Amino acid sequence: WVTGGYKWLQRTADFDYLQAFIDAGKAEGLDGYAAINTMVGGKECPYGLGSDGPLFDGTAKREWASVVNTSEGLKSCMDMGTGTKFLNPANDEVVEYLLGILEDLAAYDVKGIILDRCRYDDNDLQSDFSEVSRQKFEEFIGKKVENWPDDIFSPGQNSLDNYVTAMQRDWMTFR
């Protein structure tokens, strides 16, 4: 928010924002914490502001984005309009990517690292239903899911009924 309106500010690659905050805090006798939007891969901004984050700048692969079980079928969160785009926590490449970021953060002299949004997508129980999650879930339960994802949740279902099936319990445990 600059001069009464939105303005996209370009960041420079050679300025270390975290170190600048750590230094300023230490000068005032304050401890610093690093916080990361852990499973967030980016944001598609409204109002023509564009997009930001590793899913948009090429750092992350599009296949890393969570897949949502919508009423119209399975959709990548990248194809669902504006808003926050989550990474799939079950994807090994995502985990390795995030561990690299955490390793970088751990090199700073901070009191701690806060893992915000270290969870599945904002779409209630509707994510992640990617092929990666299917394979990992089937390994977890030791059998194939015949009707994916309908054996767990019907298209667009975003809450649990009074009766929770064994497959739903297994899915929630897996997640």
Predicted regions and their residues:
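Anion (oxyanion) recognition and catalysis
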Residues: 19-26
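Aromatic-lined carbohydrate-binding/catalytic grooves of carbohydrate-active enzymes
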Residues: 1-15
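Short, well-ordered coil/turn segments that N-cap beta-strands
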Residues: 26-32, 109-111
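Second-shell loop/turn segments in exported
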Residues: 7-11, 84-92, 102, 164-170
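Active-site neighborhood of glycoside hydrolase catalytic domains
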Residues: 97-100, 104-116, 121-122, 126-175
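Active-site-adjacent "subsite" loops/lids of carbohydrate-active enzymes
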Residues: 33-108, 156
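Solvent-exposed loop/turn segments at secondary-structure junctions
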Residues: 1, 38-42, 119-122
